[in-house]
Every structure is written in C-alpha cells, then in structure tokens.
Amino acid sequence: MQSYCPRMRVDYNKLVRDRIPEIIGSRGDRAVTRVLDEAAYRDALLAKLVEEAQEASGARGEELPAELADVLEVLQALAKALGMSWEQLLALAANKRTRRGAFEGRIFLEYVEQAR
C-alpha cells in the first residue's frame, strides 16, 4: 500500500529566468507559472533589478561577478521591455558620464555646507 505524501507549496511570486520552470520540473517538482502582460512584466523587472542589486551588494569574492551578471541580464531585459536597444542604453550612460562624470575617482560625498 502506497502512502500519500502531499506536496509542500513554496510561494515565490517573482520573475524568473526562462528555463527555471524546466529545471524545477527536472527535479520532480511542479512549477505553477503565468505569462505577464507588458506592464506587469516591466514592474516585475524593476522588482527583479532591486532583488539582484541587493544580492550583488551582499556578495563577496568569487560570488560577486555572477551576481553582477544577473544585474546585467535584468538591465538588458528592462531596456528591451522599454523599447530600447542595449546600444541606446549605453549611449545614455555615456552621455550622463560626459555630463556628470563616472565613478572612477572614488569620490565619497560626506556632506555639503550650503551657502544661505
């Protein structure tokens, strides 16, 4: 006689990479998914960007490059969802770098004494 073992449900409610449901299925688990409309997709990408940036912020050593690659992947998807090419986004970044500078000088602003 076989005993019934109920599945444990774990909620994620987040955007995942395209192959994640397949990978979950290969473990014998069942992923319940849906395809987002454009507005929900953009919102989910913005949430994913925050998630990946937080993971990158907490990463150390050899983990950091992989986390930065995740941030890059989300940025590319977000640019595409906004109707921009990666080249257009890089051009915007270059323009801003020209106007405001980069982060190469390692300048950390502690405070400003404002003239009244």
Enumerate the language-model features and the residues they cover.
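Flexible "arm" and connector segments at domain edges
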Residues: 2-116
